[in-house]
Design a protein with these regions (language model features):
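Short linear sequence elements within intrinsically disordered, low-complexity coil regions
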Residues: 15, 35, 43, 94, ...
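Bacterial N-terminal signal peptides
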Residues: 7-15
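Aromatic- and Gly/Pro-enriched helix-to-coil junctions and flexible linker segments
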Residues: 18-143, 208-226
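His-enriched metal-coordination microenvironments in redox/metal-binding proteins
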Residues: 133-201, 208-227
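Bacterial N-terminal signal peptides that target proteins for export
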Residues: 1-6
Length: 227
């Protein structure tokens, strides 16, 4: 009887050992997951002919993998330059928590490339980009500004950014709307912050938080044609 129990226990141990090693996880690879993040978030700047070094191919990225991981975890890259949750922007290029986790795990697993190049996404194309024209009705804010008429706000464009600037709109009804909190922003990567939805700022709204010599443009929402 004792021998039978020992035999059964040994068999269970073997089965448990085999099951532990039978569990397989699919590795995160450049071809399947990581390239998609880079193509979507990085190549507007990091490509041949772009404003910074190329991150198009695995051979470009792999030697810099640890440096890239540290840069994205610290939110230095992509250079979005604003605190998430302070304002809501439709062109937010900051990486999601899921994307950050994928990059972190990929680097921890020694940056596998993957065996199937057909998993790579289609390479995005980029044409020549002229600086966006600033609408004549944009409002420049340097210091505290009180709006004399209603303004339909579509976004903000820092002209001379000061890190840490927190821009708010104090409405006549006493409420305060957070607009933009610059953090790690660089004029080298000057860009618009476009609101998820246009925001109506009534006459009498006070825009605060921009201390000279910093200045920010309030961008008007496109006017809708009448039908």
């Amino acid at each position: 009887m004792r021998r039978a129990i020992l035999t059964a226990a040994f068999a269970l141990g073997i089965c448990g050992h085999l099951r532990a090693h039978d569990v397989s996880t699919t590795p995160i690879t450049w071809n399947r997951e990581i390239s998609r993040i880079f193509y979507d978030r990085c190549l507007s700047c990091h490509r041949p002919g772009g404003s910074s070094f190329s991150l198009v191919n695995y051979t470009d990225v792999q030697p810099r993998a640890v440096e890239i991981r540290d840069a994205v975890l610290s939110r230095r890259m992509p250079p979005w330059g604003a605190v998430k949750g302070f304002g809501d922007f439709r062109n937010d290029q900051a990486l999601t928590p899921e994307q950050l986790e994928l990059i972190t795990d990929w680097v921890q697993d020694d940056t596998p490339k993957g065996n199937n190049p057909r998993m790579l996404p289609k390479m995005p194309t980029f044409g020549a980009q002229a600086p966006a024209a600033v609408p004549a009705s944009a409002v420049r804010v340097a210091g505290t500004v009180t709006l004399t008429s209603q303004f339909m706000l579509d976004g903000l464009l820092p002209e001379h950014a000061a890190d840490g600037v927190q821009i708010v709109a104090a409405l006549p009804n006493g409420s305060v709307s957070p607009l933009l909190w610059l953090y790690g922003y660089s004029d080298k990567y000057r860009h618009e912050f476009l609101l998820r939805k246009p925001l109506v700022l009534p006459a009498g709204t006070i825009i605060r938080g921009v201390k000279p010599p910093a200045s920010v443009l309030l961008l008007p929402a496109p006017s809708r044609g009448t039908h």
